[in-house]
């Protein structure tokens, strides 16, 4: 294991407070946390692409006196199904996995979502440690306690709120990621900039290359991760179950989820969020909530790092149907998180279908 180095720790308040540790060489801390927890067994839920990292963690956990079970799941969103969750529960049952034992979610957002859901449901809730390895999972899926699986009706419609015991964000993993993963994950960071932290936007505008640099030296990514997690941690610490404030984290997500549903989840989530932010920015501009410079600021920041700013034309009816299924809707009205300025958030409730189509056409290609 490489030497442990902690860059930042974000404390998330709430009914079950926890810490998000951001640094490098964090396996030692993960093992220490599990060994001191009173657990007898640890179940590492991971995808095939994480086999090597899981084996390294396995050896360290065994050396610390813990029994280790591997929950091997399919890559990407294919693993977020009731069938796969059921297989995990069967394996936990076969291992006599108890209330004091711990699940570790190792991998991207799909793995951490599934690990959290499996842990939330097993014996009505066992502990989960999240170890995100993609940028998207680091700043979004692994933090906040939302867990879930997908169904034919939509993404994450079946799930639970289950806060992690701890989150370990190891920036050494960034160097192993394809450029496309760094770019896609950046969309969620940019989202937190628009809703709460203008410094994030300034960093992307002044040096976009440093915001994508995977090697830590000279990179803005560690600071961006810390800033984004700080925003999310502050929000979910006040509103775990999305009764009010937490909804602001869904900026750009109503249209994004419709895109993902239409694309059968083949689109990267971050790419869909980028297009979703362009959609809501255009709708907000049309309704007089934001000015033209803020609309253009969305486009320029996203485009500067290679995120999509438009979507396929001729798909409005399918996308509209997807938006009507969104979890945030109330009384049959489609609801959007919107801006009036950077850091100033409002809601749009029940916009006309004509206005929605106009916003869609503005980003169609």
From Swiss-Prot:
Major place of residence: cytoplasm
Keyword set includes Electron transport: no
Keyword Cytoplasm found: yes
Annotated residues for binding of Zn(2+): 188, 253, 269
Residues annotated to bind NAD(+): 75-80, 109-113, 133-134, 146, 155
Record GO biological process: amino acid biosynthetic process; aromatic amino acid family biosynthetic process; chorismate biosynthetic process
Keywords, sorted A to Z: Amino-acid biosynthesis, Aromatic amino acid biosynthesis, Cobalt, Cytoplasm, Lyase, Metal-binding, NAD, Nucleotide-binding, Zinc
GO cellular component terms listed in the entry, alphabetical order: cytoplasm
HAMAP family, A to Z: DHQ_synthase
Full protein name: 3-dehydroquinate synthase
Species the sequence originates in: Corynebacterium glutamicum (strain ATCC 13032 / DSM 20300 / JCM 1318 / BCRC 11384 / CCUG 27702 / LMG 3730 / NBRC 12168 / NCIMB 10025 / NRRL B-2784 / 534)
Lineage: Bacteria, Bacillati, Actinomycetota, Actinomycetes, Mycobacteriales
């Amino acid at each position: 294991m490489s030497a442990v180095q902690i860059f930042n720790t974000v404390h998330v308040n709430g009914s079950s407070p926890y810490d998000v540790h951001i640094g490098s060489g964090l396996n030692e801390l993960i093992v220490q946390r599990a060994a001191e927890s009173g657990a007898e067994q640890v179940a590492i839920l991971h995808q095939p692409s994480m086999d090597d990292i899981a084996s390294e963690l396995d050896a360290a956990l065994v050396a610390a006196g813990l029994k280790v079970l591997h929950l091997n799941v399919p890559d990407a969103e294919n693993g977020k199904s009731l069938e796969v969750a059921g297989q995990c529960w069967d394996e936990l049952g076969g291992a006599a996995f108890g209330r004091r034992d711990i699940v570790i979610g190792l991998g991207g957002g799909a793995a951490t979502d599934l690990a959290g859901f499996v842990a939330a449901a097993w014996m009505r809730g066992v502990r989960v440690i999240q170890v995100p390895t993609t940028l998207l999972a680091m700043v979004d899926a692994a933090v906040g306690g939302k867990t879930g699986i997908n169904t034919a009706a939509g993404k994450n419609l079946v799930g639970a709120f289950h806060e992690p015991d701890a989150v370990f964000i190891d920036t050494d993993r960034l160097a192993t990621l394809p450029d496309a993963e760094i770019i896609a994950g950046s969309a969620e960071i940019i989202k937190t900039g628009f809703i709460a932290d203008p410094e994030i936007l300034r960093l992307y505008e002044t040096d976009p290359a440093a915001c994508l640099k995977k090697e830590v030296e000279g990179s803005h990514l560690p600071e961006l991760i810390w800033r984004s997690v700080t925003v999310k941690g502050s929000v979910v610490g006040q509103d775990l179950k999305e009764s009010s404030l937490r909804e602001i984290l869904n900026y750009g997500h109503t249209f994004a989820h419709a895109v993902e549903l239409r694309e059968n989840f083949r689109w990267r989530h971050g790419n869909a969020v980028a297009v979703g932010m362009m959609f809501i920015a255009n709708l907000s501009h049309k309704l007089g909530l934001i000015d033209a410079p803020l609309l253009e600021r969305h486009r320029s920041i996203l485009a500067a790092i290679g995120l999509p700013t438009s979507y396929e034309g001729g798909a409005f009816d399918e996308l509209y149907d997807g938006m009507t299924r969104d979890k945030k809707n109330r009384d049959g009205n489609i609801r959007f998180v919107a801006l009036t300025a950077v850091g100033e958030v409002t809601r749009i409730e029940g916009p006309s279908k004509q206005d929605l189509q106009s916003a869609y056409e503005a980003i169609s290609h």
